[in-house]
């Protein structure tokens, strides 16, 4: 056991539903065996009275959204939380509130992905064009859609990327279908992907890929089909069985995602936002074989990730060690780590595949300024079954040093306070 962990204190705030779903008490017990004290925070009391805290783990998404709706109680809770963070910059926060705000807004997170992909210049990645609709569709809507590279069919999602309503989506096949769209929302080109979704669950330097069912293929271009309204959570459940996921036939390219691409995307998001606990939804374009990021989620459910608690504890140990040694520990490149796969049917897509290194990937970002600066920074500068794929460790841990996380809080604070 690492002796530097003895006496460390980890505070957490999660909804009761999240605590039960994750069985978070088991994580608390795992921490105690390593000499770490785990404290369940009560935000109705001053956090100062519950400290000192070396690490805070939270999912304040509901509270943040309610605060943005000017709910007085939620505003007070967020203020109290941020006040403690500001007073204790040495406390590691998983994850910074400004980063969570970005991930709660699909329009902002899609724009961030677009900038990351433009910088990576990796031909294996090409996420779909998107556009935010802020008002009811009018005469100029089709022109704006075309200007932004959108074509039928496209998928319509709520702008807010959290909560029950965030899973309510629609596939629109023609101009008549636009009448049913309720703004504010984000529209995104629908990419045929042979009804397979890959959910990437990231925990610090580690990630696990879980295969889920997804929407079947649809013909490109305008058609006379009526819009399809669906709940993405229900469609992509491991045991989901729906006419929307029943693939008529496999078309074009059908392969699993590249570990290298996932590693680089995960690393780039960590560097851009300073986040450690997030999920990435990836599909493979069945015409080009390219990876498309269709959503990014803050602190997902980690269903199917058997090593979640171990990964989380290891990540906490890494960032605490980096803090105690002045960041030296985080400069080492962690080796890839594979977990044993879950039982899978023969011919499953979960077989390992090694990809050649691409010099154009953002593995060369270390020491460079990233171009996907936030608005504030720019201003200051001027199928059917669930299958688990290999569990990896990201090849770089520099993106989550405590100093970097505090930089993210500072650089995004102005933007967050204005939302």
Curated annotation (Swiss-Prot):
Positions of Mg(2+) 2 binding: 295, 297
The reaction(s) this protein catalyses: 1D-myo-inositol 3,4,5,6-tetrakisphosphate + ATP = 1D-myo-inositol 1,3,4,5,6-pentakisphosphate + ADP + H(+); 1D-myo-inositol 1,3,4-trisphosphate + ATP = 1D-myo-inositol 1,3,4,5-tetrakisphosphate + ADP + H(+); 1D-myo-inositol 1,3,4-trisphosphate + ATP = 1D-myo-inositol 1,3,4,6-tetrakisphosphate + ADP + H(+); 1D-myo-inositol 3,4,6-trisphosphate + ATP = 1D-myo-inositol 1,3,4,6-tetrakisphosphate + ADP + H(+)
Similarity annotation: Belongs to the ITPK1 family.
Highest taxon listed in the record's lineage: Eukaryota
Assembly and interaction partners: Monomer. Interacts with GPS1/COPS1.
Post-translational events: Acetylation by EP300 and CREBBP destabilizes ITPK1, and down-regulates enzymatic activity. Deacetylated by SIRT1.
GO cellular component terms listed in the entry, alphabetical order: apical plasma membrane
Keyword Isomerase: yes
Name of the protein in its database record: Inositol-tetrakisphosphate 1-kinase
EC number: 2.7.1.134, 2.7.1.159
Cofactor(s) required, per the database record: Mg(2+)
Role noted for this protein: Kinase that can phosphorylate various inositol polyphosphate such as Ins(3,4,5,6)P4 or Ins(1,3,4)P3. Phosphorylates Ins(3,4,5,6)P4 at position 1 to form Ins(1,3,4,5,6)P5. This reaction is thought to have regulatory importance, since Ins(3,4,5,6)P4 is an inhibitor of plasma membrane Ca(2+)-activated Cl(-) channels, while Ins(1,3,4,5,6)P5 is not. Also phosphorylates Ins(1,3,4)P3 on O-5 and O-6 to form Ins(1,3,4,6)P4, an essential molecule in the hexakisphosphate (InsP6) pathway.
